[in-house]
């Protein structure tokens, strides 16, 4: 049947699942080809791991990414991480892994920062809201 690799990328509330399989170099985000993603800055962010890996590596695989939750840029970052992980795991190349880490660590490691939960006091204002202190 061929080699199949499944990876996950996360950013804030967005979760992306990438499935890499042997193919001709097609990459789709939520069934949309990566070339048709608009605006351009989102497409360029998604293309970073692909451009770093090179055409000869990408032309051997197809990657399908499904992204859910979060906002627009959170989804792009999650998809980017999932694509980066899928490429490295599919090729099994340590050089490529080191190249990705040297360029940007978030290509392989999900950003662990999450929104801080609201605290009980004055919870509608946010997690750290306090009344302003006056000295006079």
Curated annotation (Swiss-Prot):
User: Pfam families annotated for this entry?
Assistant: Ribosomal_S9
Spell out the Basic residues composition-biased ranges: 120-136
What GO CC annotations are associated with the protein?
Answer: cytosolic small ribosomal subunit
- GO biological process annotations for this chain's record? maturation of SSU-rRNA from tricistronic rRNA transcript (SSU-rRNA, 5.8S rRNA, LSU-rRNA); translation
**Protein origin, superkingdom:** Archaea
**Which PROSITE patterns does this entry report, sorted A to Z?**
RIBOSOMAL_S9
Q: Which UniProt keywords apply?
A: Ribonucleoprotein, Ribosomal protein
Chain intervals for the UniProt region annotation (Disordered): 111-136
InterPro entries according to UniProt: Ribosomal_Su5_D2-typ_SF, Ribosomal_uS9, Ribosomal_uS9_archaeal, Ribosomal_uS9_CS, Ribsml_uS5_D2-typ_fold_subgr
Keyword match NADP: no
A GO molecular function for this record? structural constituent of ribosome
List the NCBIfam families.
PRK00474.1, uS9_arch
User: Which family does the record claim for this protein?
Assistant: Belongs to the universal ribosomal protein uS9 family.
What is the protein name for this chain?
Answer: Small ribosomal subunit protein uS9
Q: Which organism is it from?
A: Methanocaldococcus jannaschii (strain ATCC 43067 / DSM 2661 / JAL-1 / JCM 10045 / NBRC 100440)
